[in-house]
Amino acid sequence: MVEGKIVQCIGAVIDVEFPRESMPKIYDALILEGSELTLEVQQQLGDGVVRTICLGASDGLRRGVVVKNTGNPISVPVGKPTLGRIMDVLGRPIDEAGPIESENKRSIHQKAPAFDELSPSTELLETGIKVIDLICPFAKGGKVGLFGGAGVGKTVNMMELINNIAKEHGGYSVFAGVGERTREGNDFYHEMKDSNVLDKVALVYGQMNEPPGNRLRVALTGLTMAEHFRDEGLDVLFFVDNIYRFTLAGTEVSALLGRMPSAVGYQPTLAEEMGKLQERITSTKKGSITSVQAVYVPADDLTDPSPATTFGHLDATVVLSRDIASLGIYPAVDPLDSTSRQIDPNVIGEEHYSITRRVQQTLQRYKELRDIIAILGMDELSPEDKLSVARARKIQRFLSQPFHVAEVFTGSPGKYVPLKETIRGFKMIVDGECDHLPEQAFYMVGTIDEAFEKAKKIQ
């Protein structure tokens, strides 16, 4: 191993000098002598000096400390020994359950699969959440984004998806906690443990309190583990919470490295960094990666460069709205803003397609009439419009659903609604078969039959 020494420390940025003839390559991992600390090479400054980002706390570092070059990028353990374990960005266990006995290691920097290896799929993935299955259905092997501002329910929605898909799915899952709260990571671990699926999940955490280098690379660590399972011919679920923190860590690192910021202070390489990550999250002829990514939307502004860059990579976007959350309708998915590439009669079938479009038309009409209702009241509307409004309000309430993961808070048991039941329920509402029922009967129920039962109790 070639040795160098630290010549400058500025926060998480460490400059290391090596002999000129053996200068480390970009992304090489360097190790500090006598410590567990790893540095990753980001720039070559010339004359044997490289600029690195510290993957860990840089407290106590000083000039002259000896650094060794491993000659390879950061490699993490992959395969079955990682299942049921919690790891950090370097693949080291942080669950105090002993070392990870994995013979296979894989570099976190990999090329995206070649064009001829890709295998797009149109097979639907049922989630059991009415609004998602109806409005923005997921494809097996597709990429899904949960967009929302602070506190509208991204993490709860993701937990419910994990609960409904990962438990039914039976395959392996990888969860990458990128710059989120440690408490959520802890809750998730115990949730998995209690439902006996922990032995099928690998957990990788780089939480809010960690240096930017860790938060930037932890998504790649999780992805590398998911890629390994995919290349072994398995269908993997890959959950990321939160992609925005990945971008934010990139912004911090970019500023530390002295690059000029671009729009809104983001790094100039935003699109490239996002592309490098997203292009690897894909399905090949060997196996599939179905990914669900939470995306924080700063100040509820979907045109912010970070969420805007993410949009282009996704097959389905689930947009969570503060207005809908304020009505008490959860999940607070906006049925007019959320989209999916699967909404095509050739993929989901003519019936599902027409019901989805009719539901959206009814809700859109209600949205247009809201101003008139606010100014003139309901009495000024035509009979057709009154009917549209009544149905739209029923649809709005029927799009709500009690979640399994929120049982502790709400006290009402969670509901899993099969796709056929979802389509049947909304078909009955738009066909006018539920016009005689009060709208509160549709709030927080599972199937349409439960709404009829609830209506009897109300009346």
UniProtKB/Swiss-Prot annotation:
F-type ATPases have 2 components, CF(1) - the catalytic core - and CF(0) - the membrane proton channel. CF(1) has five subunits: alpha(3), beta(3), gamma(1), delta(1), epsilon(1). CF(0) has three main subunits: a(1), b(2) and c(9-12). The alpha and beta chains form an alternating ring which encloses part of the gamma chain. CF(1) is attached to CF(0) by a central stalk formed by the gamma and epsilon chains, while a peripheral stalk is formed by the delta and b chains. GO terms for cellular component: plasma membrane; proton-transporting ATP synthase complex. Pfam families: ATP-synt_ab, ATP-synt_ab_N, ATP-synt_VA_C. Belongs to the ATPase alpha/beta chains family. It catalyses: ATP + H2O + 4 H(+)(in) = ADP + phosphate + 5 H(+)(out). Produces ATP from ADP in the presence of a proton gradient across the membrane. The catalytic sites are hosted primarily by the beta subunits. It comes from Burkholderia mallei (strain NCTC 10229). The keyword Ubl conjugation does not apply. GO terms for molecular function: ATP binding; ATP hydrolysis activity; proton-transporting ATP synthase activity, rotational mechanism. HAMAP family: ATP_synth_beta_bact. Its main location: membrane. This is ATP synthase subunit beta. Its EC number is 7.1.2.2. It is a peripheral membrane protein. Disulfide bonds: none annotated. It is found in: Cell inner membrane. ATP binds at G148, G149, A150, G151, V152, G153, K154, T155.
